[in-house]
């Protein structure tokens, strides 16, 4: 299973803005995240990318601490050995001044 999870704070507390920032950092285009109108996770703000190679990226906003977010890779195929891509994603977002990294799951 491919996985990655990065917990961070974003002072502006806007899931769409942080989605555009992360989309630009990872994909060089600001509009890869979508889906806020369809909450997939127990009525918490959640945006996601299209499925690519059996995975998608998701950003979830904590409903209690609205400046707290989680960026994760969701493997929809869930086959094979564990592959952790946390370090690779951190490489692209760690120097972004708008993001304060909180916790990295590995």
Where are these regions (language model features)?
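Short, extreme N-terminal segment that most often corresponds to the first beta-strand
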Residues: 1-30
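Sequence-level detector for tyrosine residue identity
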Residues: 10, 39, 56, 91-92
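Short, intrinsically disordered low-complexity segments
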Residues: 31-72
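Short, surface-exposed beta-strand/loop "edge" segments at domain boundaries and coil↔beta transitions
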Residues: 12-19, 55-56, 76-87
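Generic ordered-secondary-structure signal
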Residues: 11, 15, 33, 41-47, ...
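A structural detector for beta-sheet-dominated domains
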Residues: 9-11, 49, 60, 72-74, ...
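Short secondary-structure junctions
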Residues: 24-36, 95-106
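Long protein-protein interaction modules used by eukaryotic assembly/scaffold proteins
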Residues: 67-69, 75, 79-106
